[in-house]
């Protein structure tokens, strides 16, 4: 899967021209070439997620591999959550769905546009988190922050996007 569409590629010329260098660094150093991505992503999931993140780490050889590999392990976690649900193992179902939501979120970060693939991953992430919330054992509610003209605009290098927050407790 290509992380950039042709229109995005034209807008980010330097990234496109130097992509070979980033791919060489990832091939040499691995997925954590610039930051402790695996560590901070896995932290809320706990040690049970370590095999998933290690699989991604071992299989990513270039930038375009990142979204695909995270999505694949996310789908596998969804399957495990469904099997746990059918077997009546609520705690396992909860863990698998939470981990899947994190994995799908990680699959989204190297996609720089609102493509069909990014929207698919967003839907999978939200569905997994909603499934987690159903059996969380504590209140989990979706809250939308509205601005004057719709969702509260936030963003970084991209266009504004709806804000999502989480808060423990009441």
Q: What is each stretch, according to the model?
A:
Residues 70, 119-164:
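N-terminal cap/lid segment of alpha/beta-hydrolase-fold proteins
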Residues 90, 94-120:
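Short, charge-rich amphipathic alpha-helical segments embedded
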Residues 164-170:
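Phosphate-binding active sites in nucleotide-utilizing proteins
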Residues 78, 104-111, 129, 133:
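A structural signal for well-ordered alpha-helices, especially hydrophobic packing surfaces
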Residues 86-90, 132-135:
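Flexible helix-coil transition and linker loops at the boundaries of alpha-helical arrays
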Residues 70-74, 97:
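Short amphipathic alpha-helical heptad-repeat segments
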Residues 1-66:
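Long, non-catalytic architectural segments outside compact domain cores
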């Amino acid at each position: 899967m290509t992380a950039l569409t042709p229109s995005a590629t034209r807008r980010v010329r330097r990234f496109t021209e130097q992509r070979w260098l980033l791919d060489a660094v990832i091939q040499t150093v691995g997925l954590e070439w610039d930051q402790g991505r695996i560590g901070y992503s896995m932290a809320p999931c706990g040690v049970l997620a370590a095999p998933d993140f290690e699989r991604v780490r071992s299989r990513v050889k270039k930038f375009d591999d990142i979204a695909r590999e995270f999505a694949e392990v996310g789908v596998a976690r969804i399957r495990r959550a469904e099997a746990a649900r059918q077997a009546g193992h609520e705690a396992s179902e909860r863990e698998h769905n939470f981990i899947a939501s994190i994995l799908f979120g990680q699959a989204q970060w190297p996609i720089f546009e609102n493509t069909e693939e990014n929207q698919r991953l967003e839907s999978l992430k939200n569905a997994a988190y909603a499934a987690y919330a159903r059996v969380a054992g504590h209140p989990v509610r979706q809250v939308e922050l509205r601005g004057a003209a719709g969702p509260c605009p936030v963003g970084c290098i991209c266009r504004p996007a709806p804000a999502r927050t989480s808060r423990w407790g009441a």
